Amino acid sequence: MVDLKKIKNFAVIGGGIMGSGIAQVALLSGYEKVSVIDLNNEILEKSRTLIQQRIEALESEEKCKEFFANNDILKNLDFKKKLASFESVGIMANNVDTKTIMDRLCTETDLSKGVKDADFVIEAVSEMMELKQTIFKQLGSYSPPWTILASNTSTMSITKIAQKSKRPDKVIGLHFHTFFPITGVLIEITPGEKTSNESLELGRKVAQKFPSLFGERFTVQLEKESPGLIANRLAITGSLYFNWLTNQAKNSGISREQLEAANFSSEAADLIGIDTIYYCAKYFEENVSPEFTPNERLTDLFYAGKFGRKVGEGFYKWNEDGPIKNLPPVEKKTTDFIAKVFDPEIYSAIQLNEACKLLEEGVVKSYELIDKAILKGTFMPGPFVVGKTKYKEWAEKLEKFAKISGKSYLKPCAMMKTGKFIDYK
């Protein structure tokens, strides 16, 4: 049995939006010290301000509603109930005030100083393998020998990240499936080839302790590595369909703005970060299939430094109130195109097929677990909910689509075509 009480000092590598969000839930979990480490002092100052604002927003129902006024889901939550629940707001449910919590936050530009007494470290930097390997090599030298070293990556191999750490048995993947950790539920835990069971179990207990405004965390421990884990693997593969649809629209004289106006929004991409999505697509391109090559628009935004909300511009321009869209009225030729070309069942079929591949590859053992992970991560039904009865029809559709689109990666796998997934309940 692992003892969570041994985790007293917590460190986060990276002071961006994601790192700040992780630090917030770590502080609310009640650790004695939480350190945010970044090379840039200005980023650390912004991180401290953001963390304090987000914690202050949980002090009362009034502040909560004001802070989340533009969030269509959170603005309708029963905050009185949430504010009284440790699972929702952590130690604030025990009347611990913001000042006391913020006094436990440390910021540091020197990695060696920031992790010298850390019991648990989470890395939340850009999705670049070389950068992560460099950080984990340093963590292996600077942190105590018992420290668990976690990466928030959803894309990259934990085995490769751990190679230079000098302690691959202590390295795990711990991925928040959200860009705002206090509002997410799903956390996916991933082993590397040499990760110990004790490290995985401790990581899982740490993950379950993180508060969420939606209540108790749902943690999934994968049996083995998979690019994208569960939720992002399905999402990234599904993006192949929307990339194809965008190209078809362009060839039909329909602008991206028209598609955006017709509810094919890129807002989530701006929130996640154009750079993050670009690096993920490149990793899939190099490690899964060349068909995941980043599309032209994403590539242009990446090289222009338009990384989304965090820099004020991506697919949209952003201000404090959100994206500035100024979209045109939807034209008839756009609605006609969508009615003729867009088939949501193809997207569902792609997700079902990729979920079946996860079972075939032994990444997870149960289709019900995949469905639950998708539900908890996206608040949408998982692929098997309808796929259990429509897999034959969807397999035929997907076979045809893979042929006309030239995307052979999307061909239905044997498990999807036969329905054998039903044996993996």
Feature annotation, model-predicted:
Residues 27-28, 114, 179-184:
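Short, flexible turn/loop "capping" segments at secondary-structure junctions
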Residues 2-8, 12, 30-31, 201, ...:
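NAD(P)-dependent Rossmann-like dehydrogenase/reductase catalytic/cofactor-binding core
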Residues 31, 143-147, 169:
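A short helix->loop->beta-strand "cap" motif at the edges of active sites that frequently abuts
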Residues 1-81, 138, 142, 209:
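NAD(P)+-binding Rossmann beta1-loop-alpha1 motif at the extreme N-terminus of oxidoreductases
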Residues 39-45, 57-149, 156-160:
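Rossmann-like NAD(P)-binding element
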Residues 125, 148-233:
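Rossmann-fold dinucleotide-binding core
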